[in-house]
Amino acid sequence: MFAALLALAVIGANHRVIFFGETFGLRDFSVFGYPLALQLQESLKAGELPLWNLLSECGHPFLAQWNTMTLYPPMLLTVLFPLGPALAIFCLGHQYLGGLGMYFLARRWTRNGPGAALAGVLFTFDGIMQTSLMWPNNIAALGLLPWVILAVQTGWRTGGQVLLGAVLLSGLQLLTGAPEMIVFTWMFVLLALGHECKRAGAERKQMLLRCGVVIGMAALLAAVQLLPFFDLLANSERLASGGRVTSYVKWYGWANFFLPFFECLGWERYGGIIHASQIWTHSYYLGYAPWLLLGLALFRNRNDFPRNLAACVIFALIFAMGPTGRLYSWVDAIMPLEWMRYPVKFLTFAKIAMPLLAAWGVRRLSMPGNRKVLWISIAMVGVLMGLAVWMQYNVRLPREGAELAHWNMPIRLQWFGATAIAVVLARHVRGKGRRLVLFGIVGISAADLLVHQPKLSPTVAAGSYQTELKHAQELATARHPDGRAMPSMQAVESQVYGPLHELPRIIPDMRTWLAHNANLIDRVPLVGGFYSLHLPQFRRL
């Protein structure tokens, strides 16, 4: 039942992709995900494995970039079908897969159906997951994440064929090319392993051995992708000169968990809400249910795993503050973190953990002695909401988004009130009515997440990427044999961003001005490019 309802929710939220053949068009999807997928598609159709990209940065490694997903088997979908809708459906399929996997993982850990349903919905539709639809590699890794955790945990318990499945799933995730998401996956695996090892007796060594086998075999399975990547990383400018840390959460970034438009830049410049302090994700909003249920998951719970998980979430939130949180700088002094330029990505750990903690909270909602804990939790979340509202009016905000944030505040208070009332009712109602109220919490959370920031993943007609552009054709055909185009950065930046309603214009303009990787769409050789890793020789040029 949950699988069918989740599928309907994903289809309903993205009906223009499913029924009208549209594709995504915001930011990195248009200048990174789509062009790279097109390069892969054209190479494979020509019977070639794209080891090298001749069109960008005067020649650049393609397969070794890792996030090009050259060796990720599901990318064959984009080769067999029209790329625009196929790539969008690829992303939506992984979004759905991740939510379904989180449902089964939460059900395994909590043995509670409504709690597992809430976890699945939160994981599927939270702000980071919806934003990740513009990064095919990230959404693919997130979609496999709960399945890897579930398979590896089952594998170290039972061994046998399940262990082989864990190896295959883990190796498959390694081919997605999303390093941070893969690291967070295995942080969860090791947390769960440590928790079980504490309680295990003679089986402890066997569990550790089986987990080690999965790690080793998965790495061996993906070695054809990992070895070129690490070679490129070792010779890239990121390690050669030290990565520049950008996009981290400021000290008041916690307010965005309760007021998604807090400290934001408006629609007109970026086509979507962007936080002034970080540009990686448009939102990291989780809804109100996880925070209202958090106290129930942590207090008077004999199982200490939720508390360990919550402690790791706190550390992740501090890491997400980057240099301003001090902890990131201290760890960086011991173990260089240049490979992660965006500390805000540590919020992904909270995005994974909070749905599971919410599921534990639902399980313990009706247990005796928890009434006081629930009311204290509601009061604390209410105080944080009030503080966020006060800061919204008294802390200096970017002028572009202040009016929008003030307009959104009453709507947020209504959603908070509706969620809090539903949680209280679920605590007091008995019998069949209680189950209905619990699924009401799931429905409220899903609706809240889907509407908390409209147009998180806007779509455009697939033809926006396919229309023949005379200017691009001239550059591609009437050039000097060894020549390359080199647009100014100012011209590029002026074309990449703009209001949502202008996306059908922005994408052709982006192609005309060769913004980032748009040159791959029209096969125009370019001096520059938009990649995670760059060779030092290109940087010097």
Name the predicted role of every residue range.
Residues I18-L36, F62-P73, L239, G463-E468:
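Extracytoplasmic catalytic/substrate-binding loops of multi-pass membrane glycan-assembly enzymes
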Residues M1-A3, K372-V373:
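N-terminal membrane topogenic signal
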Residues R27, V31-P50, V214-A297, D332, ...:
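Periplasmic/ER-lumenal interhelical loops and adjacent helix-loop junctions
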Residues N137-G143, A151, G155-V167, G171, ...:
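Contiguous transmembrane helix-bundle modules in multi-pass membrane proteins
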Residues I11-F19, L44, L77-F81, P85, ...:
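Membrane-interface helix-loop junctions at the exits of transmembrane helices
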Residues Q41, T78-F81, F90-G101, A141-L144, ...:
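Transmembrane alpha-helices of multi-pass, membrane-embedded glycan-processing enzymes
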Residues L100-T124, R157-L163, K372-W375:
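Transmembrane-helix signature of polytopic, membrane-embedded enzymes
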Residues A405-W407, L436-L541:
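Soluble catalytic regions of membrane-associated enzymes that act on cell-envelope
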